[in-house]
Structures are given as C-alpha cells and as structure tokens.
Amino acid sequence: AFVGNPAENNRVVYLGGFGGYIIAGFDHNIVNKAGEDFEVILMKSSAPEPAVVYVMPDLNGDAKPNETWYELKGSQFSNSKRNYWVRYYRATSTADNITWLDSEGSRGELKSGYLTASTASWWWSETKTDSITFYGTRLPDSYENTGTASAQFWTVPTGKFAWGYAENNSGTDYDADNGSKKLDISNAVDVNGN
C-alpha cells in the first residue's frame, strides 16, 4: 500500500499477513453518491492480494477512528469468514519466525519471501506483550494451484475477486489507468452482515 499519492511519493507499506492495516483520515466528508465514492491506489506491479476495506463515519466529530467500522462488502462476501481472528506470537530469538494461531485452531508461522533469515524483526514495535490479536473478515484463499505436485503453478482464478477489494489488480472495479480500485460506500455492512 502506498502512503500518500504514489505519483508524488514512492514509499510503500507492506501490510503483511492477516491483520495488516492502514487508517486514513480525511479533512472532508466522502459523500455516498450513486456508484463509486472513493478509490484505493495500489502498486500496479504487485500480485493480487485482495484486502477487505472498512469505513467509519465520524458521527461524534472528533476526527478520531473511535466509532463503529463497517466492512465494504465485495464479491466474495458470502464465501468469507466473519468474526475471524489471528493471534501472533513474538519470536523467541532473532533466528526464529513469528508464529500464529487462528480462531479455527490452525497454526503456522510468518515466513519472509524477501530472503531474510527470519521474521522476528517484523514484530510490532508498539506491542510490548508477547502476543497480539487481530479480528476481522477472512477472505477465501486467493491463490489456487493449477499445476501438479512436481510442477506447481499458483494463480488467482480470473473473476474470483470480481469487485470490492483493495490491493487486487483485476476485477470490474479496477482502473488500470491509475492502478486503483473504485469502491462504493453503499456496500458497507455491520459485523452481522446487515
């Protein structure tokens, strides 16, 4: 995810696995008009990594993200898991990876795809405890292996994430000219999907 306007700023933020997020505030209201209301610019050269987008009205006017968040429903809404969580555990040494447990009892570890020895340095600097938990919606797996056991070929099937997700460089709401996803506030739903 870019921070700011990518035409003016080349800084990139890697959001990582489940729970990575950026909160963006605005000095004006975004009006919910017919059709798309705002866009999220993504890295044009990146692989599709569909991400859920949440919005929050500032009803109390304090300009802080302290009210109810609403998920923007996308094309995989009915295939997603609500009230999902992942708990990450601090690596016990600089040579180890961060491990995780999810709300379904699955376990694993964060592994770097950037040729670093471990993911221990990825730990959240503001987190002083040995674990941190993120809650949200889990999308279906993006990639599918269309190859064989000896010759794997992982790809995101065309049309799987047709609309409604950030960091997804395909679909009906993707604007290839500026590399953005055009999103509609009318798709906002509460934690119960209403």
Pin down the residues of each PLM region:
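Short loop/turn segments immediately following beta-strands, especially the blade-tip
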Residues: 56-62
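A domain-level signal for the mature, folded cores of soluble proteins
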Residues: 1-51, 59, 68-194
